[in-house]
Regions:
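Active-site-proximal beta-strand/loop segments in catalytic clefts of secreted hydrolases
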Residues: 25-27, 50-52, 152-153
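Surface-exposed, flexible loop/turn segments at secondary-structure boundaries
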Residues: 30, 54-55, 155, 163
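Short, conserved alpha-helix that lines the donor NDP-sugar binding/gating region
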Residues: 1-15, 137-138
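Short beta-strand-to-loop acidic/aromatic patch adjacent to the donor-nucleotide binding site
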Residues: 8-30
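Conserved catalytic core of nucleotide-sugar-dependent glycosyltransferases
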Residues: 32-120
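C-terminal catalytic/acceptor-binding lobe
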Residues: 105-106, 110-165
């Protein structure tokens, strides 16, 4: 995926080879070809399916990057199962995990390298170390590139839980 290190911030995705889309797929996501087809047919620059996090209640997506909520709760308000129950059409979010994410050619070409890097967030009195998916979502926001999620694409997320006394 990386370009040539000697190109510094001007690195090209796949060394400049042609591509149409890139799909991020976590190794613990369970999906069907029709899930992919739904994302692809929307023809958006950045389109994601939804998957539940380990609490089995919230999705790895944040509709509103609400720093007041973060300061009060120590995290952002992740989409809840009830939040998508009546939605039929794709909608914008400000953050999404990269477990099942389709990105169209042209998006990475607008972002300076490094595309992914850990971020140290400072939101008022709160400080948080965030991973590369947060960084990329913030970069997309600064470039006014919207992130969409498809409420009808809810893929499986295999999690194994170890319980101890």
């Amino acid at each position: 995926m990386l370009g040539k290190p000697e190109d510094g911030e001007d690195q090209k995705l796949f060394d400049g080879l042609e591509y149409d889309y890139i799909l991020w797929l976590d190794n613990d996501v369970i999906f069907s070809p029709s899930d992919f087809d739904k994302l692809y047919k929307e023809d958006k620059d950045v389109m994601s399916g939804l998957y539940l996090m380990s609490d089995n209640t919230h999705f790895a997506a944040v509709e509103l990057w609400d720093e007041e909520y973060f300061q009060s709760n120590g995290s952002f308000e992740f989409l809840h199962k009830k939040d998508i129950g009546t939605r039929l059409l794709p909608f914008k979010v400000e953050y999404v995990g990269f477990g099942f994410l389709l990105v169209k050619k042209g998006v990475f070409e607008q972002i300076s390298y490094p595309w992914f890097e850990p971020t140290y967030l400072e939101i008022k009195d709160c400080k948080d170390f965030s991973m590369e998916d947060v960084t990329l979502c913030l970069k997309l926001s600064k470039l006014n590139i919207p992130i969409h999620v498809h409420p009808e694409v809810v893929v499986g997320h295999y999690k194994q839980i170890e319980m101890r006394i």
